[in-house]
Amino acid sequence: MVMTRSLAVILLGLLCPAIPADDWPQYLGPKRDGVWRESGVSLDTPPRLLWKTPLGGGYCGPAVAKGRVYVADRRGKPVGSVQLPKGQNPNFVRESLPGDERIVCLDERTGKIVWEHKYDAPYSSVVLYAIGPRCTPLIHEGIVYSLGAEGHLLALSADEGKVLWRKNFVTDYGLEMQEWGTAAHPIVHKELLICTVGGKGSTVVAFDRKTGEEKWRALSAPKPGYGTPVIEEINGLRQLIVWDSDRISGLDPDSGKRHWYATFRPSFAMSIGAARVHENLVWVMGFNGRSAAIRVTENNQSTKFAWVPSPKKGVAGVMNTAYLRDGHVYSGGRRGQFRCVDIRTGERLWESTKPLLKANGSGRGAWQSAFTVHHEPSGQTLIFNDHGEMITASLSPNGYEEIARTYIIEPTHRVSGRMLVWSHPALANKRVYCRNDKEIRCYDLSKK
């Protein structure tokens, strides 16, 4: 029997189907763990720019689902701003700034706008950081969920941008707007959309994800904080972990009932990074040298610190979520150091300034940050520093080894005398999607 070449190719394709590409439908990826599981990519050669599309300002990263890219921005109105009471420190000066927030849907292949939805959103937060939305859109079963910087929560149809339901955390729940706006990414759990909201008895609220009907509310705190809630299994029990301005709490995600809590107050309520969990240890970190590991008891009813919190232990990263692997935390932290820490002891195994500086060694500044994504197939880690560089590195408890570095996007936001970009990229379909306050870019990372 003679088999033609074309028939052989067809049969091979049937027997060995292509590995499906992965979407990135929410903050930190499909499983909200900062891990990219897609193979067939090259991480040690400069990526090829496929397209770029103009955007307004914003910290929120893009999300990718079913051939579309979703991102949010703000276009301010410079006329008509009203001065609010000022403080001494520019990091706390607030004004009322007119402007619109916008949710944008792009074609993944071309970057062309498919639809957009904008709404009035005057800002009342600190002017220096009143750039745009903080939260990456979440796409789940045909619905896009977007949370703006002033507490506007919208659910829209993913295909055409039709508003299905909406909430306003200020008018609906009495949220007193925090200095740096609302920044905790919503998450989906079963039929619920769970959000950090604010207001009396409503630090965290669960909505019916299809209708917006409130299903439960829980906790009170002076401020809700900025950290994204997470759902993890501890001692065999799935738990919702929330860090507000007063404490870390473990809740039943179905009902909002609290199992345990630990008092640990982040400076200025800056609980930005999402909690990470290893076995029965819950890791949190924040501004001003604050980091800790909380040990949850076997009955899931009480806690104790695994080690005494100290500025000399932990990482204390500010704008990013740490990456946790095999009991070791990797993150940018205080004083421009990227660190590896043993979560069980708080001991710093090593630290390096290289990932947080530019390729030429310059660029030291305040609140240096980096977003870390582990690439599971290669065992390598991608580090996106706030200079607009993408670094490929090998991270282990033994040290930091840099493999490649590429400049992918211009830093456009000025803070403390330097330009930076604080936006988590998306990694999907062998591509990286990144944005600043001027544009969104798409690069090809596929292996040739």
Language-model regions: role of each:
Residues 1-4:
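N-terminal secretory signal peptides that target proteins for export/translocation
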Residues 6-18:
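Bacterial N-terminal signal peptides
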Residues 19-448:
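Noncatalytic, solvent-exposed loop/strand surfaces
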